[in-house]
From Swiss-Prot:
Protein's UniProt keywords contain Acetylation: no
Membrane topology of the entry: Multi-pass membrane protein
Family, similarity comment: Belongs to the amino acid-polyamine-organocation (APC) superfamily.
UniProt source species: Escherichia coli (strain K12)
Name of this chain's protein: Inner membrane transporter YgjI
Residue intervals passing through the bilayer: 9-29, 42-62, 84-104, 121-141, 159-179, 197-217, 233-253, 264-284, 287-307, 336-356, 365-385, 406-426, 432-452
Cytoplasmic side: 30-41, 105-120, 180-196, 254-263, 308-335, 386-405, 453-477
Cellular-component GO terms for this entry: plasma membrane
Amino acid sequence: MSDTKRNTIGKFGLLSLTFAAVYSFNNVINNNIELGLASAPMFFLATIFYFIPFCLIIAEFVSLNKNSEAGVYAWVKSSLGGRWAFITAYTYWFVNLFFFTSLLPRVIAYASYAFLGYEYIMTPVATTIISMVLFAFSTWVSTNGAKMLGPITSVTSTLMLLLTLSYILLAGTALVGGVQPADAITVDAMIPNFNWAFLGVTTWIFMAAGGAESVAVYVNDVKGGSKSFVKVIILAGIFIGVLYSVSSVLINVFVSSKELKFTGGSVQVFHGMAAYFGLPEALMNRFVGLVSFTAMFGSLLMWTATPVKIFFSEIPEGIFGKKTVELNENGVPARAAWIQFLIVIPLMIIPMLGSNTVQDLMNTIINMTAAASMLPPLFIMLAYLNLRAKLDHLPRDFRMGSRRTGIIVVSMLIAIFAVGFVASTFPTGANILTIIFYNVGGIVIFLGFAWWKYSKYIKGLTAEERHIEATPASNVD
């Protein structure tokens, strides 16, 4: 990007971008089901102690690679070299595979609310089969061009935000007016039970507070430079943390956490609110269902091809075959998108085999999505630790405090993430076969494949090319 286009984003613009990238009402539902009111303080702590420092870590990498518009591959390469840069970029795509498995059943549930006015209860087998058909359709649409999806998704996302804020306002009004909450709001209810199961669910909180990598890239584009960026990110983190916490406190005013479902929880809480205020419940179900369905279906169609396109545009040529990465007339690597479809199929089938209900299925899928989502930030944190420990001399306009401060902060984050990742990979009460073949097996196979692919790639390079590829900061001008 040219210098004339730099410093064009105002503080409010960055605040809006940050909010859009991080906050999601569905995250409130998911964590409320697992943690109840204890999710309220955990959301606030996660945004303060994870989101803000991780944003600053990314901002420092962006500052180090200020002459590059590339993303995570360039950031990690500047500290750990090409192999770990490829592994990290690969894990970002890899996480999206699990994201699809958790998104598809929600699309189906919200379609049911939108067109029927209620959630049609299906078995895990039926849900999985319909999800596979839906994902095949979304892959076909996304590879054949979906130009109108952006504006549609933007409008429905805005409507969902307005619905969320209206719920918070009306639920708060009802609470002040003397309504008896479905779940009592007490200090004791907000104190987490610090056990192994809780440690595993904390990854759900961290996943909800994610999005730093999509915001921190604007550090060079903000009016006022890095100082303004830091101020806005801290303010945004506090604001989002408070909003998540307030949402978590108010989510059970009308509906108990025990009654909420992963698939249609958003509609359930609005249904409860409509019943309290005497609004037409069926109409509310259809409206919230339609907005949620449109937003999620649009997101599904857009994200089916986008991660593949980003991944193959970042990594060096030659790691994957030319036909695999070849773009079609719509600028999408169609063959890679269909390979992605084939990979997602077993990721949907395996957890289905160990689930008695759709709620069990969603629990397994979301848990694994959260566990997998820990890997990319963890690799970036390790890269940052190496940057501050061994390469702190490299010139950059922005640093997250002194060398010692940076090392201490990132070391604490690495420790928390490592424990959370292990706890969510080996959850209590889970089917042992599901853990072995899905949780552990999936990660080992995918990361092992990435390691093998990169090793095969560097064998075809000259000695000089291997040296450049392996050397940290070789991409930093």
